[in-house]
Amino acid sequence: MNNQRKKTGNPSFNMLKRARNRVSTGSQLAKRFSKGLLSGQGPMKLVMAFVAFLRFLAIPPTAGILKRWGSFKKNGAINVLRGFRKEISNMLNIMNRRRRSVTMILMLLPTALAFHLTTRGGEPTLIVSKQERGKSLLFKTSAGVNMCTLIAMDLGELCEDTMTYKCPRMTEAEPDDVDCWCNATDTWVTYGTCSQTGEHRRDKRSVALDPHVGLGLETRTETWMSSEGAWKQIQKVETWALRHPGFTVIGLFLAHAIGTSITQKGIIFILLMLVTPSMAMRCVGIGNRDFVEGLSGATWVDVVLEHGSCVTTMAKNKPTLDIELLKTEVTNPAVLRKLCIEAKISNTTTDSRCPTQGEATLVEEQDTNFVCRRTFVDRGWGNGCGLFGKGSLITCAKFKCVTKLEGKIVQYENLKYSVIVTVHTGDQHQVGNETTEHGTIATITPQAPTSEIQLTDYGALTLDCSPRTGLDFNRVVLLTMKKKSWLVHKQWFLDLPLPWTSGASTSQETWNRQDLLVTFKTAHAKKQEVVVLGSQEGAMHTALTGATEIQTSGTTTIFAGHLKCRLKMDKLTLKGVSYVMCTGSFKLEKEVAETQHGTVLVQVKYEGTDAPCKIPFSSQDEKGVTQNGRLITANPIVIDKEKPVNIEAEPPFGESYIVVGAGEKALKLSWFKKGSSIGKMFEATARGARRMAILGDTAWDFGSIGGVFTSVGKLIHQIFGTAYGVLFSGVSWTMKIGIGILLTWLGLNSRSTSLSMTCIAVGMVTLYLGVMVQADSGCVINWKGKELKCGS
């Protein structure tokens, strides 16, 4: 039997040595210390120092450190941080006093000189880029190596919009109200302020411009930003649609075929309808239209033409004429003043002085292209001054106007008027076209006020005009901004708070009051930012509300105004007077359409065989009695029976029948005209008074005694002429004079003052209108009939 003990595979565990070693190794201590510190354990100073270390290295703290940081008492933590600041300041002073070796400086200079170094007034100037923000900028000076620090927040890309100011020398004091400082000598610094896309800084504020409302001109031309144009276009669309139902249906069909949705179809139809009213008869499609009617034998007619209105003249045995003032042109107007509405600034420079060192100065202050401002700022140890107090500061920036507007003076001798005369022929193409193709244009200038135009088949018409616009150009300025123009009040234009320069043509413009478009920001110890306001074009458009808008084309300006003309019709002949009356029947081509002047348009086609002939046309009541209507188209005739004829007439108020033709074959059309004769009388009277107010000085001519009576007569006729015609339309010339004499006699013999004055006034007006007719009129004496025949 083998009694020997077997060897164990592993040594047995010593129970006496099972406890941990009481003295830790170095690695164990470091591991335990760092682990506790990361969890926030340890003395407060140690933990706060570790937090500062982590922040310098941009390492995020752990949750334990954040928890311990939140548990610190405020006063104790502040005392510890103040101690840190004191120690760091001592370290900085030690480093500043240490003399660097030449080898170390030579090693640092290539990396520090990433900027451009130049001089300004014998002092060093740094031109830095965006990458130098927060870096130490080192360069050699006579006083040694100068180290500058720049922490400007507006440091951007280099461009013409630069900022230049002086960095103060600071050694021991902490910087205060400065973003740049040096340790050896004062140094100028220049940098750009543009963004990466090259855009300049702008202030979005707009200048407070007084509106032009209430200072506009009293003309029929619509004003800027008014709703008149929109309403006129809507009325044109309505009239055109009712007059041309076939084209309206075609437009509806096209919109339905092109559009894919109800909204799209509606938009397309509206756009089509807004375009179509451009095809309209010359005077029929114009809302402001005046009728001037002369009697048999009239040889001349006085008319006053306005922009936006049309005059239709009628006289027996004379053709009906549509006359319109197309445009009033002025060439090469003199520039009164230029205003700047958009500018940019560059080369912003600031200089400052410490207290008791006098006023700050800049060379740019003497340059008229720079805008400058002086102020005072707080200075002291923290920004390079030995004394505390107010120091002088001046900032200048170069001003350049980018967009400007011009105010021009219009001179009478530079005016040129274009008048178009169209004969009412009844041609179907004339009705469907508003162009100048069917009219004849006459040109009137102050040098050539008389013009004779030839009207095909109707003879010659002589226009003898007085080239006076009725506008007082001493009070009116033609304002031009980009491609738009307005007529504005001169004093309003001169009072606009915008930078201005004279209208004289010079190689270099000198702007006054540039500060109106420039904003100087809050001034700091060594620097002041300057920004320019944005474009004022929108503010100007708003301020021009109520001004008369003008259309411009090239160098010629078209604007509102008046033109007084005498139409000499002695050479005019009426075509077709010798034709016989048509005996055949007529067919209505289109439904009778009403115009906006109370007249109707009738388009008929002749079915007879005796053309050419005159078309019988009349207005009758239910019993067949001819009523007092008016035929606008003089002597309507049929030349070619294959072509329709358009006839314009004015039926009486109420129910009536429009009769085209004669006998049993006549075409009889029922018509109802709204309104009343009395209402029309008051409306025409008010319109005449308004016309006299609009014409102003053009309605008066006090050059002689005869001129005085002519002007007074014109006033009476313009205001009371229509009312007189309605009240005494069926009274003979002798009876009119008798009524006027009777009323005047009653007034002279009345004991009541008010009744006497009323009777005398009414009697004199009645007597005057019965004997003489003025203004838009034509007169001739008929000795055989003992009557003075004039147009009304």
Swiss-Prot record:
This is Genome polyprotein. Residues 1-101, 261, 747-752 are cytoplasmic. Glycans are attached at N183, N347, N433. Residues 1-15 are annotated as: Interaction with host EXOC1. The keyword Secreted applies. SUPFAM superfamilies: E set domains, Flavivirus capsid protein C, Viral glycoprotein, central and dimerisation domains. The transmembrane domains of the small envelope protein M and envelope protein E contain an endoplasmic reticulum retention signal. Residues 120-242, 281-725, 776-792 are extracellular. Residues 378-391 are annotated as: Fusion peptide.
